[in-house]
Curated annotation (Swiss-Prot):
Its main location: nucleus. This is Spindle pole body-associated protein CIK1. Present with 98 molecules/cell in log phase SD medium. It is found in: Nucleus; Cytoplasm, Cytoskeleton, Microtubule organizing center, Spindle pole body; Cytoplasm, Cytoskeleton, Spindle; Cytoplasm, Cytoskeleton. The keyword Nucleus applies. One of its GO terms (biological process) is karyogamy involved in conjugation with cellular fusion. Keywords: Coiled coil, Cytoplasm, Cytoskeleton, Microtubule, Nucleus.
């Protein structure tokens, strides 16, 4: 295919990309011989050593038999051998490009099948489902609106019928009552007419006259009662009519409010229906766009499948090579597991031996401290940075001394030679000083550590104080006091819970930090205490304090077991430091406080 990513193979070209000029028949024979020699399985072995995310690393190893075969084939001509090697490099390059193109096409096809098609299908299904749900909701709302309208009409008709029934019922009752009264009046009138006619025909009789008067009086009384009953009936009818009018007004108000609410709900539903119709139109347009995109993706997928099929055919021989190299890789991994097992065994042995060495080193440090205590001389440690020392000085670790090669050869022996750490946390210095401190802390004997340096020593003092507080804070009641070298100012009882205060106190170079350890932790326990003096001086200050007696330093030296730590690096005057260390070794003797 013209658009394939598989590079073409090329053979028989000079370094300047110029094809050699020889006859076509001869050229084909030479190419056949060279290709047979390159592709023969006995000439080259492809070993895949590692497989990682960046690809497959390959290396080719030529057998000695291949070189011998080349010599026999071409008669040992170096030009032909060089040309064969060039062709072999091009074949390797073509194989690498084929592998890269195959991996890219596989990644693209996997990405299309695994990500884009499912996402588009899910999106289309979701939009179709949403359209159906919206249509169902619109139909339901329309049905509900029709039901509400029917209910309103039915209630309106029921109210009108009930009011008409009530009026008709009361009208019938009034008419019946009037009919009864008229019937009674007509009967009474007829009777009285008969009687009157009889009376007129007869002579007047006093008894009848009296009876007529009495009846007339009763008739007037009955008329009066009838008038009263008619008035009462009219009043009750008016009151009942007013009550019915009030109830009817309340009923109309309630129904009117319901109608207003229904009108508002209908208006809101109309807006919702309009919005849903607009959304439905937009969704139709989106569905149309998605269908176009889907058709485009189908075309692209078809093209990718065609390319993928062609690449699968090209990958078949490479898969065979990959299977053979995978077997070789499996064998290498098994050998790697065996080597890792042996390495773990050696690691365990190393850890055990390291523990023994550390224990022996700790015992040797305690013995060295005891020997130094017996000798009675002051202890001098060298805290050296060999990378920053001048060339004329070097460290002899066996004899624990620093040697000067320029001029007169000078050797200064120290009790310890401690190498300064790269990260400068000064814990190695503390580990070297702890045997000296433990010996006197266990016996509650005052001791001191003085750092001799021209440079700032606050980090060293801070590390010593912090490590001492962490190690002995649970078994002793501890207080930190500040004593200036002139003896004029003294700060006492500084809190140890705040690391900021310890850092601020250790920044002062012109004072001694006094850490007091007291065994009295409870009220009933006895109090036994000792002091640990931690300070720093330059070589000039230390010489001056030693010469000017009495002084604060001379008082500390006579009352404590002291240890001097000399910093040895490019920023120090190493000659003066070595001379001062020798002077301290010769002149100062430890007090016998044990």
């Amino acid at each position: 295919m013209n658009n394939s990513k598989i590079p073409k193979l090329s053979f028989h070209s000079d370094p300047n990309n110029v094809t050699r000029d020889f006859p076509k028949t001869k050229r084909q024979k030479v190419q056949k011989r060279e290709m047979d020699m390159i592709l023969t399985p006995n000439n080259n072995k492809l070993n895949i050593l590692h497989s990682s995310g960046s690809g497959i690393r390959r290396c080719y190893t030529d057998d000695t038999s291949a070189t011998y075969t080349k010599k026999l084939t071409f008669g040992g001509d170096p030009k032909i051998i060089e040309r064969v090697k060039n062709n072999e490099r091009k074949v390797r390059k073509d194989i690498d490009s084929l592998l890269n193109a195959i991996s890219e096409i596989e990644k693209e096809s996997v990405r299309i099948h695994a990500r884009e098609l499912p996402a588009i299908t899910l999106e289309l299904d979701a939009k179709v489902k949403a359209c159906r749900e919206l249509q169902n909701e619109i139909d339901g709302l329309s049905t509900e609106m029709d039901l509400k309208d029917n209910q309103c009409d039915l209630q309106r008709k029921n109210v009108e019928l009930s009011s008409k029934n009530i009026v008709s019922m009361h009208a019938v009752k009034v008419q019946e009552f009037e009919n009864d009264l008229e019937e009674e009046l007509s009967n009474a009138k007829r009777e009285w007419t008969y009687k009157l006619m009889e009376v007129e025909n007869l002579k007047p009789d006093e008894r009848l006259t009296d009876e007529m008067r009495q009846l007339k009086t009763e008739f007037e009384e009955v008329n009066r009662k009838l008038f009263i009953l008619q008035n009462e009936n009219e009043n009750e009818c008016k009151n009942y009519k007013k009550e019915l009018d009030k109830k009817f007004e309340i009923f109309k108000k309630v129904k009117n409010d319901a109608r207003i609410e229904l009108d508002g709900e209908q208006e809101r539903l109309s807006k919702v229906l309009k919005d849903l119709q607009d959304t439905h139109g937009e969704l139709k347009e989106n569905i149309k766009t998605c269908r176009d995109e889907f058709n485009d993706f189908e075309k692209r997928i078809g093209e990718a499948e065609v390319n993928f099929h062609s690449m699968e055919l090209a990958v078949v021989p490479l898969k065979k090579k990959l299977a053979s190299t995978s077997q070789a890789l499996t064998q290498v991994q098994e050998e790697k597991k065996q080597v890792e097992g042996e390495a773990n065994n050696w690691k365990k042995k190393y850890v055990n031996e390291l523990e023994k060495v550390q224990q022996e080193l700790y015992t040797r440090q305690n013995l060295a401290t005891s020997i130094e205590e017996i000798k009675g001389y002051t202890r001098c440690f060298a805290y050296a940075n060999e990378r920053q020392m001048p060339d004329e000085f070097h460290i002899n670790y066996v004899d624990r001394c620093i040697c000067e090669n320029s001029g007169e050869k000078r050797v200064q022996v120290f009790d310890r030679v401690v190498l300064e750490e790269i990260h400068k946390d000064h814990k190695r210095l503390y580990n070297e000083c702890i045997p000296f401190l433990e010996k006197y802390i266990s016996k509650l004997i005052n001791c001191s550590i003085i750092v001799v340096s021209q440079q700032p020593t606050a980090p060293m003092k801070k590390t010593l104080l912090k490590q001492l507080i962490e190690q002995y804070g649970e078994n002793y009641k501890m207080t930190l006091n500040i004593l200036h070298l002139d003896g004029s100012i003294k700060h006492s009882d500084v809190g140890l819970d705040n690391p900021t205060e310890i850092r601020d106190l250790s920044q002062d170079e012109e004072c001694m930090n006094i850490l007091t350890l007291d065994t009295k932790l409870g009220k009933d326990e006895e109090s036994h205490s000792m002091n640990i003096y931690i300070g720093s001086m330059s070589t000039v200050q230390l010489n001056r304090e030693l010469d000017d007696a009495p002084s604060v330093l001379s008082h500390i030296l006579t009352k404590t077991k002291q240890c001097f730590v000399f910093k040895i690096n490019a920023g120090e005057n190493i000659e003066k430091a070595l001379a001062l260390a020798g002077k301290l070794k010769r002149t100062i003797t430890l007090p016998q406080l044990d």
